[in-house]
Amino acid sequence: MRVYHFTEQPYPDAWNDHGGSLRVNLPNRKCEPAVAADLYHRFYDEWLLADELGFDIMLNEHHQTATCMSSTVVVGLSILARETKRARLLVLGYPIGHRPDPLRVAEELSTIDVISRGRLEMGFIKGVPYEFPCSNQNPVGVMDKFWEAHDFIIKAMTSHDGPFNWEGQFFHYRNVNIWPRPWQQPHPPIWSAAGSLGNARMLGERGYVMAVLGSGYKTRPLYDAYREGYMSQGRPAPGPDRFAYLGLMAVAASESEARRRGELVAEYLRSGGIVWPPFRNPPGYLSVEENTGILMGRARERTLTRDGRVVDMRSADIQDLIDAAILFCGTPDQVHAQIAAFIDYTGGLGHLLSMGQAGFLSHQDTVDSMTLFGKEVLPRLKAMD
């Protein structure tokens, strides 16, 4: 079991005056650079602590949003590749679905893999819907573009005998010959995220690490679809190292203090999706089936507890989120028991993506929660392997 400390690096003051949208069109005059600088230093201090405590590290990127100041994940990866000593560095994800230049992606990630001496984990995603307009990209056919970018990046990383040309539907290159090549051969491990059975099966066919983000007790069918796809290629059943799950985390010495921290983290979950309606679902981003489901009132934000109770993540209380395995919250013993029960439900889980900081959770609360987890929970999870 590997546990990755994660924060989206939010700018919490924006929640006090967002005017109905935290993403895309919130004026950047509401971002004070001195405050942002302090926040960046704080988040990197927490990641360095994670490295010392035995966590691995996860980073992501989003654009034009107060919910995530990581507007280019390469900056964070570069800093941590040099400053950390042992942690695996996971990017989940790199939004190659709306990136115009996969050659640059291949160069950047290869360089980071070398600087870190082989500690990079590459997670590729298509990108969230409200970032396509501000990246000047068309969401129609995004998955075709995603897979072509993916194929090009892998070819660029694994071609070592001089330049090659590329003529695709979306990308055209001459004399591709990246320097440096990756440290890990043939390339760093590949991850992606899945939220549908079809995508889960496809990732299983490719054998990539599949991350499921906060789906609670709707996760097992996705893992089972992955297993079917994985074994359809003539392989034995996949091990736990092929499966990852992202959950919120709040640990404290007492249950009451943990729940106070959990409420601060949960409020970020409830409110982080506030965005001006025209940006929420650009034409072509979702499939016909997904849009039909939305029109029929099938909410995408709902999940289930283990006993089948429906939980709406936009309004759920702390106990609902704990029961749905969206939030792991409590004393070290309670959190360990919650995670162990969820692992048992999934049939095996090798990577826990721990969102241990979000929203208004302070630096001191974050450090204390991480330290308790790192010293009292993490060793017990590793012993379960």
Question: What name fits each language-model region?
Answer:
Residues 1-87, 188:
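N-terminal beta1-alpha1-beta2 module of alpha/beta enzyme domains
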Residues 3, 61, 80, 112, ...:
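Conserved, mostly hydrophobic/aromatic
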Residues 3-7, 57-59, 89-92, 120-124, ...:
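Hydrophobic faces of well-ordered beta-strands that scaffold small-molecule active sites
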Residues 4-31, 143-179, 219-346, 383-385:
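An alpha-helical appendage that flanks or caps ligand/catalytic pockets
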Residues 15-17, 34, 98-206, 219-224, ...:
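Internal, glycine-rich beta/alpha segment that forms the wall or movable "lid"
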Residues 26-41, 93-103, 184-194, 249-252, ...:
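Active-site mouth loops of central-metabolism enzymes
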Residues 38-49, 108, 194-201, 334-342:
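Short, acidic/polar
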Residues 58-76, 96, 130-133, 214-216, ...:
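Glycine-rich, proline-tolerant flexible connector loops at the mouths of alpha/beta enzymes
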